Amino acid sequence: MEEATKSTWIVAALDQYEGHLLRYAAWIVGDVERAREVVQETFLRLCKEQPARIENHLAQWLFTVCRNLALDVRKKENRMSPLKDPETLPITCDRPGASLEHEETLSQVLRLMETLPKNQREVLRLKFQCDLSYKEISEITQLSVTNVGFLLHTAIKTLRKELLAESEKRRTQ
């Protein structure tokens, strides 16, 4: 592949995946600045790769490299704290208070997610924040596709149960 085409390919990958990788790495290392370093290193490694070798599974390759680098950083620093300030997209809504309601629900879901086992949190984030398929998640986490599906199902079921319980509790107060 000629250099101009490779550069275009890398820029396209950066545009498409940088935000998702940054949120994923920040969740693992617990710090946005360290996550930026991890994502930067991920893309530096992409620059050294032959596009033909990974173009059919670029997302899996990027997330796997990012995950491994982030885990190395976390292991070195031997600590992990939850991401306190998650990025959210602004919501436009005609109904007054809907945006605040959405933010409260999102905050509640994120708080409840922190109570889930680590493997369930990871597959949830890869699925819903990064919009990856079960197969891609399977390759990144080295779990079977069936196990990914089970973890997602269990996590969603648990979150739904907890959200309903909290909602009912608020209603009766």
State the predicted function of each range.
Residues 18, 22, 43, 117, ...:
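C-terminal flanking helix
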Residues 23, 37-44, 48, 56-68:
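Structural recognition of an alpha-helix C-terminal capping motif at a helix-to-coil junction
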Residues 71, 141-166:
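DNA-recognition helix of helix-turn-helix
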Residues 80-106, 111, 133:
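Internal acidic/polar
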Residues 64-84, 102:
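Arg/Lys-rich amphipathic alpha helix in sigma70-family domain 2
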Residues 1-23, 27, 33-36, 47, ...:
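A short, charge-rich alpha-helical start-of-domain segment used by transcription regulators
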Residues 123-127:
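A short pre-motif secondary-structure segment
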Residues 10-12, 108-116:
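Short amphipathic alpha-helical boundary/capping segments
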